[in-house]
Amino acid sequence: MARNKEIEIDTRLGRRSVDADKVVHFPRGLAGFENERDFILLQIRPEAPLLILQSMSNPVVGLLVADPYSFMEKSAYAPAMGEAEKQLLRISDLDEAAVLVTVTIPAGQPGEAALNLAGPIVINSRERVGLQVPQCSDGPQQIYMHSLKPVGESGQAEKSEAAPAE
């Protein structure tokens, strides 16, 4: 049985040992970080809805992300994707991928944390390829987390198949 290759990287959370097989490649990079192509998802705490999408090459580049379906019904947010994006991700439907959104927490104002719905990050967990898919909709661009009730408490939402985190 083959063992996963562990590698050491410096992160925003300190030095971490990560599974090299869980690295996600972003062929186009991310908005503002176009030259950063390889990332890994790191748990902040077990069972916490927030993760760090950490650059493999730059310890300063780590984005706070969340599964939006932990905070809202799946029917309330469906990012639009074109055929080119689906082809690049090697999926035929959004249901085959994990959807993450960046989280903004203003300094000193954790109660004003917001989910950024305008630039979802879509990851094909099986192929380990990801893409940020900017949205051009008239819908809300962000939703403040204090106005949301975690979906897990109501048990009504379908959870997306989140990409495994380290």
Swiss-Prot record:
Keywords: Bacterial flagellum biogenesis, Chaperone, Cytoplasm, Translation regulation. GO terms for cellular component: cytoplasm. It comes from the Bacteria. It holds the Pfam family FliW. The keyword Chaperone applies. It is found in: Cytoplasm. Belongs to the FliW family. Acts as an anti-CsrA protein, binds CsrA and prevents it from repressing translation of its target genes, one of which is flagellin. Binds to flagellin and participates in the assembly of the flagellum. This is Flagellar assembly factor FliW.
